[in-house]
Amino acid sequence: MSNVNPVTEKSVSWHGLYILADRALLPTRIETEQGDFDVEPIRQFDYRSRLALIEALAAAFMTGNPEAEVPPIENKKKPTPMEKLVGAKSWTDLERKSIYFSIMVYPSTVRLESWARASDGTWSDEKETALDITIPLSAGVEGVADTILEHLRTRRDLPGVTFDFPQPKTAKGA
């Protein structure tokens, strides 16, 4: 969608969107001296609703990635907040139950990435993206949401889901 190279710009914020069969999770991503972490609060919403997706993305973009202390080391041995919400047995189980979007916001663009499936049902490695697109920031949160929804219509690899988004009625068959 854009030929702007986000590599030349420093990111403004980075967000992870987890699409599940029945909902989406958009955790708060904090910035620490040891890297970024997904933490609570976690927005849960119906991703099939364009308005709900736009509202969740807009709130995340406004919040950005707050600076925070590194989560306690003992948390590494515990399930992540996303695993708990989903009832996943492990991170691998969470990956098998979800489609993940990395959303990098830059001053002039937004880069969206989503990974294909590996043979074991988890997300493929970083070189095997099912989506890797740069959207001009001028497209707004609406453009980002629309790109996510368009991509989800092409995916057939989320357990328990058939993507059947509401379609406008036409004179034929209405």
Q: Which residue stretches match the model-derived regions?
A:
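Intrinsic N-terminal pre-sequences and regulatory tails
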Residues: M1-H15, K97-F101, T154-A174
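Negatively charged, low-complexity tracts enriched in Asp/Glu with abundant Ser/Thr
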Residues: S2-V7, Y47, L51, E55-Y100
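Serine/threonine-rich low-complexity intrinsically disordered regions
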Residues: N5, T32, D46, N65, ...
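Intrinsically disordered, low-complexity regulatory segments enriched in Ser/Thr/Pro
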Residues: S11-L51, Y106-D146
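Ampiphathic alpha-helical segments that act as solvent-exposed interaction surfaces
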Residues: Q44-P66, A130-P166
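Generic hydrophobic segment detector
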Residues: A58-I73, F101, P107-D120, L149-G160
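Amphipathic, soluble alpha/beta structural segments
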Residues: A68-K84, A88-S90, D146-A174
